[in-house]
Amino acid sequence: MQKYISEARLLLALAIPVILAQIAQTAMGFVDTVMAGGYSATDMAAVAIGTSIWLPAILFGHGLLLALTPVIAQLNGSGRRERIAHQVRQGFWLAGFVSVLIMLVLWNAGYIIRSMENIDPALADKAVGYLRALLWGAPGYLFFQVARNQCEGLAKTKPGMVMGFIGLLVNIPVNYIFIYGHFGMPELGGVGCGVATAAVYWVMFLAMVSYIKRARSMRDIRNEKGTAKPDPAVMKRLIQLGLPIALALFFEVTLFAVVALLVSPLGIVDVAGHQIALNFSSLMFVLPMSLAAAVTIRVGYRLGQGSTLDAQTAARTGLMVGVCMATLTAIFTVSLREQIALLYNDNPEVVTLAAHLMLLAAVYQISDSIQVIGSGILRGYKDTRSIFYITFTAYWVLGLPSGYILALTDLVVEPMGPAGFWIGFIIGLTSAAIMMMLRMRFLQRMPSAIILQRASR
């Protein structure tokens, strides 16, 4: 029992800074929306449209680079720290190549925006302008993620938290300068949010690099002198590990986007209630997601040390802590769901629907926690391909079709509206949790030699 308590303390020490970093990142998006809304409703809508395209694109690159964390954790645990610098340098090369692709996609996203039905031309122009300003921050964001993954792979999660809050503090005044045109800068409105956010990502990257160069704990990890050339073998391995994670993230983000589109014809009350419940459940999701990042680090580190039993302990502890957290957040959600909904909107119909949907959200919080921590465990074992297959099957084969049938058709029951989609979420997330656990048990029952061989690839 003592080993589980000790492991839980280590996991929470790693996870809490990740939680705070995620809060800072979420707050940046909130600040952009509020400050753009203060300028005009059109500018706020433009930022919202631009963000809906930016997020799937940049999260694809983010997911690809998440492969670095278990790789570095495993090298650190096995005492092969001299190989870490080369992996990081190749991560920077990969981030550079991916950022070019993302920038090309975002530059041409205007065709998608302008093809939207009944969109106001002025709104479309502002959304395109916002994206074309923001895309210059894509390399800065991805380079920052490489540096952050280096730190987190070495079990240093506090730097990412500090840089997140630095970014938030810089974002507010820079937003103000470019939105309203102060200190000789042009008045750009919502487009100024894109300029500010792009600049902030570069500031965060440079601040993180400055920390890494000065950190005593990383003195033995230095990038090669001069410019290291791309190493196709290392980059191929990072892509093999990272691409399934990237695709899983992409399909998860697009699932919620598709559901939002399917809900939109149902009316303002249904859309508002759905959005409130989704926004709140997304805030609660930060807790298990951050714990999953910590579990990846611990499992990778223990496998690097050659201890499959300690890796199992880290995995089980992460799941137990995650279930306890999810139980508490579910009780909190059920108890205060109406009061929470009132913070967003005071329309009685909207509040009633949002409170009902939050009840369904409370039901799936334990499943959601298990599936996301299970994903973190599998990343630690470098078993990322199964994450993609499980996520795709659970969300797009089981969750979305069942939600569609319940919400919009009378094949099973009378059309349930948004609640049908939320029952679909429960089906999808519970299926994902079950499949993640089955895969984890399958891996852990392999002979230790095979597990360690797979982890050292």
From Swiss-Prot:
One of its GO terms (biological process) is xenobiotic transmembrane transport. Pfam families: MatE. Residues 1-10, 74-92, 148-159, 210-242, 297-313, 371-386, 439-457 are cytoplasmic. Signal peptide: none annotated. Residues 32-52, 114-126, 181-188, 264-275, 335-349, 408-417 are periplasmic. One of its GO terms (cellular component) is plasma membrane. It is found in: Cell inner membrane. Keywords: Antiport, Cell inner membrane, Cell membrane, Ion transport, Membrane, Sodium, Sodium transport, Transmembrane, Transmembrane helix, Transport. Its main location: membrane. It is a multi-pass membrane protein. The chain crosses the membrane at residues 11-31, 53-73, 93-113, 127-147, 160-180, 189-209, 243-263, 276-296, 314-334, 350-370, 387-407, 418-438. One of its GO terms (molecular function) is antiporter activity. Multidrug efflux pump that functions probably as a Na(+)/drug antiporter. Belongs to the multi antimicrobial extrusion (MATE) (TC 2.A.66.1) family. MdtK subfamily. This is Multidrug resistance protein MdtK. It comes from Shigella sonnei (strain Ss046).
